[in-house]
A protein has these predicted regions:
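Nucleotide second-messenger and two-component phosphorelay signaling modules
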Residues: 8-23, 55-59, 95-96
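HATPase_c (GHKL) ATP-binding subdomain of two-component histidine kinases
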Residues: 30, 62-64
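Cyclic nucleotide signaling catalytic output domains
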Residues: 19, 50, 58, 65-95, ...
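Conserved long alpha-helical elements within nucleotide-processing catalytic cores of c-di-GMP signaling
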Residues: 1-11, 20-25, 29-30, 37-45, ...
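Residue-level signal for short amphipathic helical patches enriched in basic/charged
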Residues: 35-38, 95
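Short, electropositive, low-hydrophobicity segments enriched in small/polar residues
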Residues: 24, 29, 71, 99-100
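Ser/Thr-centric signal marking residues that sit
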Residues: 18, 35, 63
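Residue-level recognition of strand-loop junctions within catalytic nucleotide-signaling folds
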Residues: 31-35, 52, 71-72
Length: 104
């Protein structure tokens, strides 16, 4: 399942974007260099939609919740950006999952 998910996510991203597993579970991190917050939201929506669509053919339908943090608006170092993205992710999950949320 994780492999199918990573392939689906990777198809949406540009060659210079970064996709990697995050933490111990089923979380991923995506870094979108030289991207505006509006572009990041658009990419996140495409990621969410792609997984929703592709997973209809998988054994277990899957959805993704996405939290977005943008440099320098949400922080000027990795720790601050990760904290802001994590907060936005929690808001997405609490809002019913299968959502994209930008950090406040």
């Amino acid at each position: 399942m994780i492999r199918k998910l990573s392939i689906t996510l990777g198809r949406v991203l540009r060659p210079n974007d970064f996709l990697g597993r995050w933490r111990m579970g089923d979380e991923f991190i995506v870094v979108l260099p030289s991207t505006t917050i509006e572009q990041a939201v658009s990419v996140a929506e495409r990621l969410r939609s792609s997984v929703e669509s592709a997973s209809k053919e998988w054994l277990y339908p899957t959805s993704v919740s996405i939290g977005i943090a943008h440099y320098p608006r949400h922080g000027n170092n990795a720790a601050a950006l990760l904290e802001a993205a994590e907060y936005a992710l929690i808001v997405s999950k609490q809002g019913g999952k299968n959502r994209v949320t930008v950090a406040p």
